């Protein structure tokens, strides 16, 4: 039996709260069950040096976990003086995923930074970050349209992400921490709304998984992402 008696293909309860803070151009609190992430979008009229003069924009991301987002306190990475390899991997994943949903030429020479700060962690922090940051990015873009900075919407489509895995021989969707820590196979899937894949990260923690199990996990991920798209569209009024 899964935590909270969920079906194998059932994600946790998803809640997306827009305009959670007042200063950022986009601000979202996203909740996947007990995992909670604050995602903010900041617009700057500048691009990285390697893009100057090319007439296109940039979307990037940063990711971090608050010290007591976990069961025991973690030292802040700022206090350590460097980011962990895990943190750098996750923020690159978030950035790649969000760039896939934007026409960077239509964005013009400006950059949008998504800051994803984990308030409470119970598994799936990177997938929750992508899901919430996608909504925050839409809000930031809408602010540019409303103030006349952009004439056309550069958003190509929504992006969502979810974890899937094999736990006790069963393929399951949206793993909580207790499931993730016991998973024989763990996978994160990022998708566009039209069903195309942006990223598939899958690892056999125990026994290798079969081709058939891979297809089952991808199907579960598609079902889960489709439910997330419904939640995103509803909160955005689309």
Swiss-Prot record:
Gene giving rise to this polypeptide: rph
Job description of the protein = Phosphorolytic 3'-5' exoribonuclease that plays an important role in tRNA 3'-end maturation. Removes nucleotide residues following the 3'-CCA terminus of tRNAs; can also add nucleotides to the ends of RNA molecules by using nucleoside diphosphates as substrates, but this may not be physiologically important. Probably plays a role in initiation of 16S rRNA degradation (leading to ribosome degradation) during starvation.
Q: What is its EC number?
A: 2.7.7.56
| Source organism of this protein record | Haemophilus influenzae (strain PittGG)
* Family matches, as HAMAP family: RNase_PH
> What interactions and quaternary structure are annotated?
Homohexameric ring arranged as a trimer of dimers.
The keyword Manganese belongs to this UniProt entry's keyword annotation: no
Q: What reaction is this protein's catalytic activity?
A: tRNA(n+1) + phosphate = tRNA(n) + a ribonucleoside 5'-diphosphate
The source's superkingdom equals: Bacteria
Instruction: State the name under which the record lists this protein.
Output: Ribonuclease PH
CDD domains associated with the record: RNase_PH_bact
Q: Which GO terms describe its molecular function?
A: 3'-5'-RNA exonuclease activity; tRNA binding; tRNA nucleotidyltransferase activity
Q: Which family does it belong to?
A: Belongs to the RNase PH family.
The UniProt annotation places phosphate binding at 86, 124-126
Arranged from A to Z, the UniProt key words for this protein are: Nucleotidyltransferase, RNA-binding, rRNA processing, Transferase, tRNA processing, tRNA-binding
A GO BP annotation: rRNA catabolic process
